[in-house]
């Protein structure tokens, strides 16, 4: 397994419950595909460097995981089709 850092930005107009629901969705996806969650950081609402999908702010979440490369590809696919996610990035950390 490799170590990854997953960063994603949720729309700022979502309610706290919906944020938690989306985070839980990705948490379940990681665990169901054999990944291990090391740490979840909720950075909260922050200003974006530039406008993304007509939003100036976003709710940042950082998740550190141990996972196989297939899971990283699956996460990328699901992030792309999830409307609540403005941007995402999956980075493999050096061992």
Curated annotation (Swiss-Prot):
SUPFAM superfamilies: Ribosomal protein S6 (SSF54995). One of its GO terms (molecular function) is structural constituent of ribosome. CDD domains: bS6. GO terms for cellular component: cytoplasm; ribonucleoprotein complex; ribosome. It comes from the Bacteria. The keyword rRNA-binding applies. The keyword rRNA-binding applies. GO terms for biological process: translation. Belongs to the bacterial ribosomal protein bS6 family. This is Small ribosomal subunit protein bS6. The lineage of its organism: Bacteria, Bacillati, Bacillota, Clostridia, Eubacteriales. The gene is rpsF.
